[in-house]
Amino acid sequence: GVVTLLTVLFNWHRETTFVPLGVLWLTALLGGADDLLNIFYGKERHPRTLGRIARLIRIHRDVKLRIWYLISFPWQAYKRLFYLLGSHPGRGVQAHEKIIIQLIIGGIIAWWLSFKLDWTELWVPWLGHVDLGVLMAPVIIFLVVFLANAVNITDGIDGLSAGTLIISYGAFFAIALKQQSSDISLLTATVIGALCGYILFNIKPAKYQMGDVASLGMGVLLTAIAFALDRPILLPIIGAVFIIEIMSVILQTTSKVFLGRRLLRMAPLHHHLEITGKGETSIVMYAWAFSAIFAIIGIWLSFQ
């Protein structure tokens, strides 16, 4: 709310700040809906198995329902894929539903960059700009979804995600200043200020939690800012902690499904470190230091 208010009052540039703020709010609404359903309104879901649905398609007396089950079978198979990968039916917005909404949000950013701003080139250090053509839109959508969930997964220990977000946004703030992009630098400075105020109440013992409302939105906005500065290739470096966290979950899930064993005692990585005896404060401090090192590397690479 603070970021939106200050940006609208003092940094409103329709071409560069309208869409980032819009997708921030869309993603925050998604996270808010999930949190509210989990706390107040949601009901536990008990989905039918695919075998049961296939049987109903063949034998149900109501022809209309048989047609409905047949039409909705691909959607049911899509849901079961997520359950197979470790998602569980709960009371809030389900993982498969979140992905669909995030893909739509990624599509909005892809439209903004590819068609509104006519960007089809990806900057690469030392190589300059590489024209991706029609592949630019899928790259944008993938990074939006990936980073949103990466930041969300990192939000598991007091101060962990907030501190690393401050460092990551700080790196892009430095890049924006160097590029003399006043609107993006003001937007990132506003986000940093809001996060600095928040982290005072989020370090251990936390009085407030970020939750899906902020973590998903912060990940999407970070990606949008990286694209606005023509530096999305640096996201895996500047956001190294987020990438490591989500990759630990992906590798853990892949190992469980295909090899039948765990790589970590618990995913994401910060929970594994907790279980092995590392204190919360130590984990957070090491993550901040690691993030700062890679942020500096990212800033250096941005000028190559």
Regions found by a protein language model. Give the residues of each.
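Alpha-helix boundary/capping detector
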Residues: 222, 248, 252, 298-300
